[in-house]
A protein has these predicted regions:
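Catalytic core of DAGKc-family lipid kinases
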Residues: 1-85
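A residue-level signal for conserved active-site and pocket-lining positions in enzyme catalytic cores
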Residues: 16, 35, 86, 113, ...
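Generic preference for hydrophobic
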Residues: 70, 88, 113-115
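Glycine-rich phosphate/pyrophosphate-binding beta-alpha loops
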Residues: 28, 32, 87-103, 170
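A generic structural signal for short beta-strands and their flanking turns/coil linkers
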Residues: 64-66, 82-84, 107-112, 147-149
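Gly/Ser/Thr-rich active-site loops/lids in small-molecule metabolic enzymes
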Residues: 43-51, 102-123
């Protein structure tokens, strides 16, 4: 224990802010981002991670037809898109994918935004999945990937209520949202690195 205390250092890390709430890892909205809330506790207890996959398979056809047309505004990107999903990440790892946001860092002062536009599932999705496992998905034509300090996301008239998840919590007020980075907001205790 004494050695552990001796060998620690602190590192300042950024935190994301959405309206009046905060997140460390990720904010997401769109397809399948609400699965964790739909899986009954008894299924989670019996099936573990498999319960999430089964719920995703069940929900996928329903959510595929959901209209999600959103307007994104930042210095780096502005546009109105028909989307399947969008992520705002503060770290590389999202939802079990180690490099979902390959340029992200918890201490760079930026949020990484990935907008996955609606696409033809039979022709475009397989290529996107292949690129995802290679870490090349930001280059896919159905993806907008950029880094920003601030982002506003607005619903359009056609868009129904979309669940917004931030680090496992549901943002009750939904859209519109203002998202920003709070640089060096937390001090983390980590093992000392030798340089």
């Amino acid at each position: 224990f004494c050695q552990m205390i001796k060998d620690f250092q602190t590192k300042k890390v950024d935190v994301g802010r959405v309206n009046n709430e905060y997140f460390i890892n990720v904010l997401a909205a769109g397809m399948l981002t609400d699965i964790a809330y739909k899986v009954p506790k008894d299924k989670k207890a019996v099936l573990g991670k498999m319960a999430y996959y089964l719920e995703g398979v069940k929900e996928f056809p329903k959510q595929l037809s959901q209209n999600m047309t959103l307007t994104f505004n930042s210095k780096e990107y502005s546009g109105t898109e028909d989307i399947m999903l969008f992520l705002v990440a503060n770290s590389k790892s999202v939802g079990g994918f180690a490099d979902a946001a390959p340029l992200a860092s918890v201490s760079d002062g930026y949020l990484d935004v990935m907008i996955i536009k609606k696409m033809a599932l039979l022709t475009e999705a397989p290529d996107l999945i292949f690129k995802l496992f290679q870490g090349e998905h930001p280059k896919h034509p159905s993806i907008e990937y950029f880094q920003t300090k601030e982002l506003s996301v607005l619903p359009t008239e056609q868009t129904a209520g979309i669940a917004i998840d931030y680090d496992g919590e549901i943002l009750e007020e939904g859209l519109p949202v203002d998202i920003s980075i709070v640089p060096e907001a937390l001090n983390l205790i980590i093992l000392r690195t030798t340089n």
